[in-house]
Amino acid sequence: MPGAEMKEPETLRPRQDARAEETRIQPLITAEEMFPALERMVMRAERELFLSFRIFDARTRLRSEGALELGLKTWADLMVHTAERGVKLRMLLADFDPIFTGDLHRSAWASARNFGSRLPDGAELICALHECRSAPVWKYVFHFPIRKRLDSMRDIPDESLTPFQHRSLRGDWDLRPVTLHQKLAVVDGREAIIGGLDVDERRWDTPDHDQSPEETWHDVSLHVEGPPAQDIRAHFAHCWQRAIDDDATCFTAEKSPVPDPGHVRKPAPPAPRVIRTISCDGSRPLQLGAKTMLREHEEEHIAAFEKAERSIYIESQFFRHAPLARSLAAAAKRRPELELILLMPTEPEEVIFQGATGFEMRHAQALQMRCLDICQRAFGDRMTTVSPVQPRPAQTNDPLPLRGGRVVYVHAKVTIVDDHTAIVGSANLNGRSMRWDTEASLVFHGREDVMGLRDRLARIWLDEHYEEGDPHSAALWRRAAEENAARKPEDRVGFMLPYPERRNRRFSRFLPILPPEMF
């Protein structure tokens, strides 16, 4: 219930059943690989299918041959088909603050209604706000932006507004600043997909990224078979129960607890491990955000950085969490030979594609520049920061081109340390993912799996540059980016260009009014 102290999810008690089978991990790079893999996995379900996504548009087209051969066209069709086969379906979709993120909130409800109106009896779908509610004082702090958004909401047709938004217009509302950000699906406790990619048409892309900038979307997920799938199931069961306890909106006839929910194990390396960020409503008098319960993403990243000896490779949508920057800097000082390759989008999505210039975006970029400065002082020329740009000239109306090329948007969350540790999942390297939002990722240590993922990504980004030196060396990535910067877009090799630090510094403004966990 709101305001109640949430019990921390159990992590240390192992299951009593046999868990000795081998774990198999397959990287899925971009939606071209992930979407069909998810469809095929769903079609293999025999007993149960559990899904938890931030964005899941019921209208998204199906891509796998098996689904299309059955005459199915959209994800709504596939969910109905799966439930009618007798598979127990539970879908947990993220909801969003009805005032500050009204468009996302309405989209979430529209998709939930689309699924829910077609699903047969026995299927269950919850669209859940995170339980955290900001203290009432923040309604006064944000009075003017709230009033502006409520005024805009009055221009929207009544039938397009949700019940939450109708209540908001009558003055009955809470600020809901935290969300479920994870992206995962698990079938029969046997196999799962976990990563950074949600499901809608906007996110469809291929490793060629041969589309207009606003259609590009680089992301990474994993298909996992073996013991971690049971842990993903247990994590889903915990999140599902919390949504029920908070009386989240149900779009089907029933919502029931997951039977035999189990516990998320904490196996020692080299066994792969599911890690989470989990928070609750702390009910502090002046609280804006959530009380952190589990910060396993932060802990595992710091532990991996402490063991780094030669090379750290990171792909992230954001790099704003100062504790991680300081941990990287400490690793650089301990290991004079340690190198860092950091790959990020040129700017945040809202800046590139929506032209956002508000103080919150400028402050968020200032947090990122601060983290880059911390690392650059420690690593010096052992660090390179790069952004992917298509080897094609920008068109007249393309948003924020870089050195004449069309940008590729990066949404991946990948950290690879030497040949012994990789982390792939939903958590960005920002305070929100480390402390507030509900997140889930997989840490794995098998050398073949770790190096296989790193080499696949390097070959995609570097292209022919991959063969010109050590792909684990920051120097090779820097040289590839600088050589491309000196060429015309159509003459470039691969995607790498130097991160546009100068224009991001001009854009950023440090305004430390709100907690860094909000960004």
Task: Tell me the role of every PLM-derived stretch.
Residues 1-519:
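Charged, low-complexity intrinsically disordered terminal segments
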